[in-house]
Amino acid sequence: MKSFTGTTQKCTVCEKTVYLVDKLVANQRVYHKACFRCHHCNSTLKLSNFNSFDGVVYCRHHFDQLFKRTGSLEKSFDGTPKFKPERTFSQETQSANRLSSFFEGTRDKCNACAKIVYPIERVKVDGTAYHRACFKCCHGGCTISPSNYIAHEGRLYCKHHHIQLFKKKGNYSQLEVEETVAAPAESETQNTETQNAETQNADTQNADTQNTETQNGSV
């Protein structure tokens, strides 16, 4: 146990003592192996697959998603992110909290899946937010964009399917409803044709009767 008595290093995350058997050092900071996690998704990190911003560590996927694609924040791509040794732990915590507040403040929910939509993946039309992956035609799953979609009764359609389902029918009733209404209409047509045929037969019989009476009178 003597090998542990002189250990006074504290974990950057939990501030508890780190023993040699559980120690991990990254960017001159000491962590418990279990505390070395992505600040965004909490997944366990390794020295070979992390990035950091202002001393806060992220998995590469979320670092790329949150910072690299925006091009607006300082970033590092070589696996050994930039480190400012003069910053204290409290300053780093404040910086991390500011970043967390920035992303946690995004409360837009996707109208399709009801999950949070971050600015980098957001499509917004008529004040309604969607994930890019969720912004598609509800009928055929076609890819659409804010410039080529049609919204009808709160649902999104590509122009092709909207015309196919609604405009060609001459009104905005659902296709299924129109098909249901069409069946009685066909029955009414058949009834009308039957009545016309019966009327013609009656007229023919009357004409034959009149001709017979005329012939009898002549005799």
From Swiss-Prot:
Residues 9-109, 110-167 form the LIM zinc-binding domain. Keywords: LIM domain, Metal-binding, Repeat, Zinc. One of its GO terms (molecular function) is actin filament binding. One of its GO terms (biological process) is actin filament bundle assembly. Residues 181-219 are annotated as: Disordered. This is Pollen-specific protein SF3. The lineage of its organism: Eukaryota, Viridiplantae, Streptophyta, Embryophyta, Tracheophyta. Residues 185-202 have a biased composition (Low complexity). Pollen. It comes from the Eukaryota. CDD domains: LIM2_SF3. Pfam families: LIM. It comes from Helianthus annuus (Common sunflower). InterPro entries: Znf_LIM (IPR001781). Could possibly involved in controlling pollen-specific processes such as male gamete maturation, pollen tube formation, or even fertilization. Residues 203-219 have a biased composition (Polar residues). The keyword Electron transport does not apply. SUPFAM superfamilies: Glucocorticoid receptor-like (DNA-binding domain) (SSF57716).
